[in-house]
């Protein structure tokens, strides 16, 4: 059995050193045609490190270490649910377990908890992942047409009245136009919004794990001209609110003047309300449908899965390719 101390005290660093070795390549149990080992590419190593760090972060939150976590714990990790929906689909969950299995194999830990977790989740009996829902171009336009607008003003005019409606409008456009997750949108920070405007009118959003979900992968998400046209007025208003109302915090879309972070539940309700105003089916209304729509449109326009992976901040190219299976659902009758 290998020395386990470093894998418990600094597991991510230990894995970084392991993933670039022949020892890691051997655990894949795959050889080239000439019988030699296939080395892990830098890009693949980066993906593996991200996945391993994500798993270790969760394990640490449970008060466990890599060598004390059980198969039952790992089953809970890949079976997590957020907002009623799986955090990881079954294929991604399996890849996490397989990666951990390779680590335990290298360390000589028996029984192998990740292997036990895989066996406990008989893959043949797992439900098939829902291919997801997307909007047609016509449905998406109706969604944009139904976005929140300023409420009717009464006789009394209050400075910045209705600012939250303009915030909600800008946020929903950014989610739809840049393919962000709701976690990425509510955690978007002012300094992550690019100032440089490209020739096509787009700007870059630099998405980092800071204030996002623990599965957020650092990436650049281009926001096209149409999205910039909605975001810039809101950012200008937000800047004035900082000066005149002492709005706090660094969130692009704060929940209140104290600068608190919006909740995913609140954003879900707002998006669902827009779906309802647009006459769209609300049973699958949410940020995920908007992200699916963005991804499917990118693939339909000729984007390669490896390109889409980078735009969406996904760890695996195969995850990006899966968006081609999303389905467009007819409007309710």
PLM regions with names:
Residues 305, 312-333:
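Catalytic-site neighborhood detector that most strongly recognizes the C-terminal catalytic loop/helix
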Residues 112-150, 256-260:
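Flexible interdomain linker/hinge and immediately adjacent N-terminus
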Residues 171-172, 183-188, 308:
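Alpha-helix N-cap/helix-start motif at helix boundaries, enriched for small hydrophobics
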Residues 24-131:
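N-terminal core-binding DNA-recognition domain of tyrosine recombinases/integrases
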Residues 187-229:
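Conserved tyrosine-mediated DNA breakage-rejoining catalytic core shared by Y-recombinases
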Residues 224-282:
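Active-site/catalytic core of tyrosine-dependent DNA strand-transfer enzymes
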Residues 145-182:
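Basic, Lys/Arg- and aromatic-enriched nucleic-acid-binding interface segment
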Residues 157-158, 269-310, 314:
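Short, basic (Lys/Arg/His-rich) helix/loop patches that form interaction surfaces
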